[in-house]
């Protein structure tokens, strides 16, 4: 039994193939999805989508929020933005994280702190997506 996974962004189809399992970051925590999972519609948090392929190799996608629908072994993820871990430049991702952390230290009001924390969450998600599960 397999799962059909489709990850869509406003600009493109990022992933469209059969997989064994996924670990999905939702607003209420991570959920693991295997074949014959209960049908749900849920929001996606900023976080790393982990995908287990048939050869037991793991792949990652940095998700920047969105929605997902799981029904009849079909998983459709509508992401605000997404990037494959293998496409992320490690040096650039680390630099972006450092800039976001500096922005938090320099934040002068509540709005700047909230924006900086969100930037840190996005940047750290990209850094985490670089290294898939072994």
From Swiss-Prot:
**According to Swiss-Prot or TrEMBL, what is its membrane topology?**
Peripheral membrane protein
Keywords linked to the UniProt accession: ATP synthesis, CF(1), Chloroplast, Hydrogen ion transport, Ion transport, Membrane, Plastid, Thylakoid, Transport
Q: A GO molecular-function term, please? A: ATP binding
Annotated compartments: Plastid, Chloroplast thylakoid membrane
User: Keyword Chloroplast: yes or no?
Assistant: yes
Q: Quote the PANTHER family the UniProt record gives.
A: ATP SYNTHASE DELTA/EPSILON CHAIN, ATP SYNTHASE EPSILON CHAIN, CHLOROPLASTIC
Q: Which family does it belong to?
A: Belongs to the ATPase epsilon chain family.
HAMAP family reported for this sequence? ATP_synth_epsil_bac
- Describe the task this protein carries out: Produces ATP from ADP in the presence of a proton gradient across the membrane.
NCBIfam families per UniProt:
ATP_synt_epsi
Q: What is this protein called?
A: ATP synthase epsilon chain, chloroplastic
